[in-house]
Regions:
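Mature, structured domains of secreted/extracytosolic soluble proteins
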Residues: 2-229
């Protein structure tokens, strides 16, 4: 599989159909791969966050938090304990709640790249986020995953996926403290809220601080829009 510069990752858990469905439609979609973003009451960065960051952004299963974490499988390879020793793409593929993300990673030929990356932070849209995107832009997922250049590092799908990834590990306190992150795609990702309830470009974190072997994963309720080029 082709390894691209911007390494990328996509990973883990939570199927939150109910959670995402309940909070997913107040932000206008962007063309080319965005679902509606749920409104969040804590969209602005907080200067009062006192939660300390974990060293190197590496978290433990006891650090996992969020309103949808109870949707993560309790046992097996797709559980929090099952994912911690697997590289991020493998961890995602083991979770039946991240099937759309996994298919996108495979189509973009990014699996080996993600698994071999030394350190990543991944903002992983759950299946309902992709369903919302498809509802707003019928046929978009097929268009992205079957494009002639889909396996190219410059394909639209690769750019969308790598926009959800950062080439360094951060925990929730770390991303909020940073306020803005450089994605592997190259564009900035804006972080708001607090360490207990962060937002990613305004989208809520549904389950965060999920550790895999080489990444810290945040399951989010929206497919992030690529900024205008």
């Amino acid at each position: 599989m082709r390894k691209i510069h911007r390494l990328a990752a996509v990973a883990s858990l939570a199927a939150l159909t109910g959670v995402v469905g309940a909070c997913s439609s107040s932000q206008a979609p962007a063309t080319g791969g965005q679902a509606s973003a749920p409104a969040s009451e804590s969209s602005a960065p907080s200067s009062e966050t006192t939660t300390p960051s974990n060293a190197g952004g590496v978290t433990k299963t006891t650090d996992i938090f969020g309103p949808a974490c109870n949707q993560v499988p309790k046992e097996g390879p797709g559980s929090a304990a099952g994912m911690v020793d697997s590289p991020v793409a493998t961890a995602a593929s083991n979770n039946p709640l991240l099937t759309t993300l996994t298919k996108a990673v495979i189509a973009a030929n990014l699996g080996d790249t993600l698994n071999s990356a030394p350190a990543l932070t991944v903002f992983a849209p759950a299946d309902p986020a992709f369903q919302a995107l498809e509802a707003q832009h019928p046929g978009i997922l097929k268009e992205l995953t079957t494009a002639p250049d889909v396996a190219s590092p410059n394909s639209k799908l690769a750019k969308i996926l790598t926009y959800h990834m950062v080439g360094k590990r951060y925990d929730a306190a770390g991303i909020v403290q940073a306020g803005e992150l450089d994605s592997l795609e190259g564009a900035k990702i804006k972080i708001g809220g607090t360490a207990e309830a962060p937002t990613v470009n305004g989208a809520p974190v549904l389950c965060g601080n999920i550790p895999t072997k080489n990444a810290t994963v945040f399951v989010i309720g929206q497919v992030l829009s690529l900024p205008p080029s």
